[in-house]
């Protein structure tokens, strides 16, 4: 028994065989180059969106970014893989509209499920989603897809769901189901609030860009990471749900144009966790 305990403790002290190298590799990778000169729907829908900090970033301020550790990067990559899987199915079906890029010569084309590159004839076309922008308000985002040929056009948002999703979006579902994520997933009856706001923003941005040609509904595709269970929710466009979000964007852009930094809208006296990072 004593020898078993010693071997166990010795094993705990051993240097990792491969994990350390992977972690160092991830730390050496450059950070993503997400623009800070536009407002991203995924950011401005948050309750902790700060006018002052957004002004700082949009006027040349540098955001404090930390590289994700191995676990967090694995979570991100798993989500990306789930997105790609669903998008690839719609591409194979011939229903996926948006911008595609040839993986060989990088020729870009906008269309519905192209199968061959017009530039070089290669068949490896990578989906680059649909960019939705409002130039006046400097809002820019990417919806996960625009589906054509299956009834009326619709946008799609693909969401991978795990325990962390429930803790952040709907902790009550975990509590009501005794922490069982499988039961919690089955009990989801509608899109989570932040997903709904993001989707409604994409619908409104689409309307502002494409007018009557824009989709009037969005389909949320939820997949449970643990066992690949899935759900879908269809939501019609309703601008009233996000009018206050666009109002927030307008407040920030007016401040940027006037070159006057606004006060923190979350805590005017002491500032918030975001704007307190401003040097």
Task: Describe these PLM feature segments.
Residues 1-155, 162-178:
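Metal-dependent nuclease catalytic cores that hydrolyze phosphodiester bonds in DNA/RNA
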């Amino acid at each position: 028994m004593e020898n078993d305990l010693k071997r166990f403790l010795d094993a705990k002290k051993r240097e990792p065989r491969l994990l350390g190298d992977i972690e160092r590799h991830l730390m050496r990778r450059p950070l993503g180059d997400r623009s800070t000169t536009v407002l991203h729907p995924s950011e401005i829908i948050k309750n902790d969106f700060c006018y002052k900090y957004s002004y700082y970033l949009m006027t040349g301020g540098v955001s404090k970014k930390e590289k994700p550790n191995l676990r967090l990067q694995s979570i991100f990559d798993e989500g990306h893989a789930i997105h790609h899987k669903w998008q690839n199915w719609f591409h194979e079906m011939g229903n996926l509209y948006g911008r595609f890029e040839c993986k060989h010569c990088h020729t870009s084309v906008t269309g519905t499920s192209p199968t061959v590159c017009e530039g070089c004839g290669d068949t490896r076309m990578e989906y680059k989603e649909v960019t939705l922008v409002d130039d006046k308000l400097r809002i820019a985002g990417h919806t996960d897809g625009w589906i054509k040929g299956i009834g009326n056009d619709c946008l799609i948002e693909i969401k991978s769901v795990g325990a962390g999703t429930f803790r952040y979006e709907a902790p009550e579902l975990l509590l009501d189901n005794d922490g069982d994520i499988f039961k919690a997933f089955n009990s989801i009856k509608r899109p989570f609030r932040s997903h709904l706001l993001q989707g409604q923003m994409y619908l409104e941005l689409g309307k502002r860009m494409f007018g009557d040609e824009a989709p009037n509904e969005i389909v949320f595709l939820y997949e449970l990471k643990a066992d690949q269970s899935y759900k879908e929710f269809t939501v019609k466009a309703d601008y009233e749900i996000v009018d206050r979000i666009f109002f927030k964007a307008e407040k920030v852009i007016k401040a940027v144009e006037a070159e006057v930094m606004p006060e923190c809208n979350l805590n005017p006296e002491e500032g918030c966790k975001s704007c307190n990072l401003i040097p």
